Design a protein with these regions (language model features):
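Short, cationic-aromatic polyanion-contact patches
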Residues: 2-9, 57-70
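Short amphipathic alpha-helical interface segments
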Residues: 5-27, 31
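A local structural micro-motif
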Residues: 24, 38, 55-56
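Short loop/turn and capping residues at structural boundaries
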Residues: 27, 41, 58-59
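Short secondary-structure boundary/hinge segments and terminal tails
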Residues: 34, 48, 65-66
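Short amphipathic alpha-helical interaction segments
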Residues: 35-46
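A short, conserved structural fragment
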Residues: 48-58
Length: 70
């Protein structure tokens, strides 16, 4: 399962690279990637815990983007 979470985290990273790191909601990200919502949420948690992802509350959803080094 850890490997699967890691691959999904890579898919999320690639998604942001391909979309110029434009902020996206969790709902849109889950709809865009061919992964289960649970796996997407676990991968987002991994990236956020590692300090690679910035999450902000957006109504009933969350908006996120990659943290880029300054």
């Amino acid at each position: 399962m850890i490997t699967e979470i890691g691959f999904a985290a890579g898919d999320i990273w690639q998604y942001f690279d391909n979309h110029h790191n434009y902020p996206v909601t969790l709902s849109k990200l889950a709809a865009e990637l061919d992964r289960s919502r649970d796996l997407i949420v676990m991968s987002i948690g991994w990236l956020a815990r590692e300090g690679h992802l910035i999450l902000e509350r957006d109504g009933h959803d969350y908006r996120m983007h990659l943290r880029r080094p300054s």
